[in-house]
Amino acid sequence: MKNILFRINELSKKEKATGLTVDEKQEQQMLRQNYTETFRGSLDSILLNTKIVDQNGLNVTPAALQDAQIRLKLSK
């Protein structure tokens, strides 16, 4: 993941400085898409394993999140 982000930043700097070739532009788009998909997958994983509790210790996790968590457990 760090390598992908490093390369994205490297291409971005080059784009601002001198521009990118067609191949580099395609690589940049592919890397950005890959990074975004990976990031979203990680975020989904974190959220699906999250429980929200108020000051009184009551579960206040939104219903939509609870439903998604139940579906995930049933699919395993």
UniProtKB/Swiss-Prot annotation:
Coiled-coil parts of chain: none
Keyword Cytoplasm set for record: yes
Localization of this protein: Cytoplasm
InterPro entries in UniProt: DUF896 (IPR009242)
Main subcellular location: cytoplasm
Keywords: Cytoplasm
GO cellular component, one term: cytoplasm
One Pfam family per UniProt: DUF896
SUPFAM superfamilies linked to this entry: YnzC-like
Annotated family: Belongs to the UPF0291 family.
PANTHER family in the cross-refs: UPF0291 PROTEIN BC_1827 (PTHR37300:SF2), UPF0291 PROTEIN CBO2609/CLC_2481 (PTHR37300)
Protein name from the UniProt record: UPF0291 protein BC_1827
The organism of origin for this protein: Bacillus cereus (strain ATCC 14579 / DSM 31 / CCUG 7414 / JCM 2152 / NBRC 15305 / NCIMB 9373 / NCTC 2599 / NRRL B-3711)
